[in-house]
Amino acid sequence: MKIQLIAVGTKMPAWVEHGFEEYRRRFPKDMPFELVEIGAGKRGKNADIPRILQKEGEAMLAAAGRSRIVTLDIPGKPWTTEQLAVQLEAWKLDGRDVALLVGGPEGLSPECKAAAEQSWSLSPLTLPHPLVRVLVAESLYRAWSITTNHPYHRE
């Protein structure tokens, strides 16, 4: 099973790239984890936000292909680390790849939300999108460590 983090936005600060990469490289070969960056639509004074969201959503769904789509969204379901580990095991048993979608400043398009099989809430707080990349990478790595009895996670 491959996991993709499909996120709107490019040109992240170095600390984001380093933080994400620190956890991405720890994933086992049989469960590769990759980042797919989607260019953000140009937002200006008279920007057509619904159209921008639609275009970003189309690109995200195209990148996801036939993967199980899981949106990261505040109204999604909050999972504890242990619950995320259970989800990870369920996804592995399902056999499909997983695409985790992170929207841009205005969130996800209605099409992305409609295509999602699950929605995951990292927090009721609004988090900066660059930080979400690092949090998701660490959370998934920690969940994997639970499923394999790796010593990274401690109770």
UniProtKB/Swiss-Prot annotation:
Keywords: Cytoplasm, Methyltransferase, rRNA processing, S-adenosyl-L-methionine, Transferase. GO terms for cellular component: cytoplasm. InterPro entries: Alpha/beta_knot_MTases (IPR029028), RlmH-like (IPR003742), tRNA_m1G_MTases_N (IPR029026). It is an enzyme of class 2 (transferase). S-adenosyl-L-methionine binds at residues 72, 103, 122-127. GO terms for molecular function: rRNA (pseudouridine-N3-)-methyltransferase activity. It is found in: Cytoplasm. Its EC number is 2.1.1.177. It comes from the Bacteria. The keyword rRNA processing applies. Coiled coil: none annotated. Gene3D superfamilies: 3.40.1280.10. CDD domains: RlmH-like. It catalyses: pseudouridine(1915) in 23S rRNA + S-adenosyl-L-methionine = N(3)-methylpseudouridine(1915) in 23S rRNA + S-adenosyl-L-homocysteine + H(+). The keyword rRNA processing applies. Pfam families: SPOUT_MTase. Homodimer. Specifically methylates the pseudouridine at position 1915 (m3Psi1915) in 23S rRNA. HAMAP family: 23SrRNA_methyltr_H (MF_00658). Belongs to the RNA methyltransferase RlmH family. This is Ribosomal RNA large subunit methyltransferase H. It comes from Aeromonas hydrophila subsp. hydrophila (strain ATCC 7966 / DSM 30187 / BCRC 13018 / CCUG 14551 / JCM 1027 / KCTC 2358 / NCIMB 9240 / NCTC 8049).
